[in-house]
Amino acid sequence: MSSRRSSRSRQSGSSRISDDQISDLVSKLQHLIPELRRRRSDKVSASKVLQETCNYIRNLHREVDDLSDRLSELLASTDDNSAEAAIIRSLLNY
C-alpha cells in the first residue's frame, strides 16, 4: 500500500500546476466573466473569480433551459412538416 501511495505522489507531483499557472488561469477567467470584467479594480481574489465563474455557468445553464423550453413550446405550436419545425428540431437536436 505504501508503494501505491508513493507512486501516486510521484504522479501528482509531476503533473502539479504552478502558482504562476494558477494565477494566469484565474486572470483569464476574470476577463471572461462579464460581472468581473465590469469592475474597475484588477485585483479580485481567486476565490471570488471562481465563485463568480460558477454563478455565471449556473446562469448560462438556466438560460439554455429556458430557451430550450421556449423552443419546445414553439415546436408544439407549429406544423410538424413545416420548415420552421425542422429548424426548431435542429436547434433542439431532435
From Swiss-Prot:
<keyword id="KW-0963">Cytoplasm</keyword>
<dbReference type="GO" id="GO:0006355">
    <property type="term" value="P:regulation of DNA-templated transcription"/>
</dbReference>
<dbReference type="InterPro" id="IPR036638">
    <property type="entry name" value="HLH_DNA-bd_sf"/>
</dbReference>
<dbReference type="InterPro" id="IPR011598">
    <property type="entry name" value="bHLH_dom"/>
</dbReference>
<comment type="similarity">
    <text>Belongs to the bHLH protein family.</text>
</comment>
<comment type="function">
    <text>Atypical and probable non DNA-binding bHLH transcription factor that regulates light-mediated responses in day light conditions by binding and inhibiting the activity of the bHLH transcription factor HFR1, a critical regulator of light signaling and shade avoidance. Forms non-functional heterodimers with HFR1, causing liberation and activation of PIF4 from the transcriptionally inactive HFR1-PIF4 complex.</text>
</comment>
<dbReference type="GO" id="GO:0009416">
    <property type="term" value="P:response to light stimulus"/>
</dbReference>
<dbReference type="GO" id="GO:0046983">
    <property type="term" value="F:protein dimerization activity"/>
</dbReference>
<dbReference type="GO" id="GO:0005737">
    <property type="term" value="C:cytoplasm"/>
</dbReference>
<feature type="region of interest" description="Disordered">
    <location>
        <begin position="1"/>
        <end position="20"/>
    </location>
</feature>
<dbReference type="GO" id="GO:0005634">
    <property type="term" value="C:nucleus"/>
</dbReference>
<comment type="subunit">
    <text>Interacts with HFR1.</text>
</comment>
<keyword id="KW-0804">Transcription</keyword>
<feature type="domain" description="bHLH">
    <location>
        <begin position="6"/>
        <end position="60"/>
    </location>
</feature>
<dbReference type="GO" id="GO:0040008">
    <property type="term" value="P:regulation of growth"/>
</dbReference>
<protein>
    <recommendedName>
        <fullName>Transcription factor PRE6</fullName>
    </recommendedName>
</protein>
<keyword id="KW-0341">Growth regulation</keyword>
<dbReference type="InterPro" id="IPR044293">
    <property type="entry name" value="PRE"/>
</dbReference>
<dbReference type="Pfam" id="PF23174">
    <property type="entry name" value="bHLH_ILI"/>
</dbReference>
<keyword id="KW-0539">Nucleus</keyword>
<keyword id="KW-0805">Transcription regulation</keyword>
